[in-house]
Swiss-Prot record:
Residues 93-153 form the S4 RNA-binding domain. NCBIfam families: PRK05327.1, rpsD_bact. Part of the 30S ribosomal subunit. Contacts protein S5. The interaction surface between S4 and S5 is involved in control of translational fidelity. Keywords: Ribonucleoprotein, Ribosomal protein, RNA-binding, rRNA-binding. One of the primary rRNA binding proteins, it binds directly to 16S rRNA where it nucleates assembly of the body of the 30S subunit. With S5 and S12 plays an important role in translational accuracy. Pfam families: Ribosomal_S4, S4. Belongs to the universal ribosomal protein uS4 family. GO terms for biological process: ribosomal small subunit biogenesis; translation. One of its GO terms (cellular component) is small ribosomal subunit. The gene is rpsD. CDD domains: S4 (cd00165). This is Small ribosomal subunit protein uS4. GO terms for molecular function: rRNA binding; structural constituent of ribosome. The keyword Zinc-finger does not apply.
Length: 203
């Protein structure tokens, strides 16, 4: 499965948003773009550049490559409601994102690894596809043989409980969670403007 393999810290500095816990620490020390002239870059940013930057933020935050991201956009357009809201809701329903939101991993990249390595079940069945879209009422849990793995315990211990949203019910003691509902747009606190992405794709 294709995924981004470059430096997420450099991308975070370029976009001005932390895309991982490690990148968050770097941004605190160096809150400017990488490179020799990172601190001195000035000038008016074009509308297209702003739109492109917001798209990049969304793609990197959710760990989605261009082709798949565009497919999410097309699906969002075909649904009723506000296209931007629909796009965010689709991304929030991704299996790897829900694992991250539930506090089973400190990062979406880590959550993606847990999923692809087959550690988790959805409604009692193994699902190893990060892009699988959960529905309200879907229950996820770690496989029995994965319950006591050091990697799983470490992943959960490093994920802050304070981040768990109201639309996911979590039982950390038993390593289980239920996806209660698709969140409304205002419930998703992420540093991007999806409307600019809609404007970019609708040209």
């Amino acid at each position: 499965m294709a995924r981004f393999r470059g430096s997420i810290t450099k991308v975070s500095r370029r976009l001005g948003v932390a895309l991982s816990p490690k990148a968050e620490k770097y941004l605190e020390k160096r809150p400017y773009a990488p490179g020799e002239h990172g601190q001195s870059r000035r000038g008016k940013v074009s509308e297209y550049a702003l739109q492109l930057r917001e798209k990049q933020k969304m793609k990197y935050l959710y760990g989605v490559l261009e082709k798949q991201f565009r497919n999410y956009y097309k699906k969002a357009v075909s649904q009723r409601g506000i296209t931007g809201d629909n796009l965010v809701k689709l991304l929030e329903r991704r299996f790897d994102n829900v694992v991250f939101r539930a506090g089973f991993s400190p990062s979406r990249a880590g959550a993606r690894q847990l999923v692809t390595h087959g550690h988790l079940l959805i409604n009692g069945k193994k699902v190893d596809i990060p892009s699988y879209l959960l529905k309200p009422g879907d229950a996820m849990e770690f496989r029995q043989k994965s319950q006591n793995l050091d990697a799983v315990a470490d992943s959960m211990n490093r994920a802050p409980d304070s981040r768990i949203p109201s639309w996911i019910q979590v039982d950390k003691a038993h390593k289980k969670a239920v996806f209660l509902a698709v969140p409304e747009r205002e419930e998703v606190q992420e540093p991007f403007n999806e409307q600019l992405v809609v404007e970019l794709y609708s040209k």
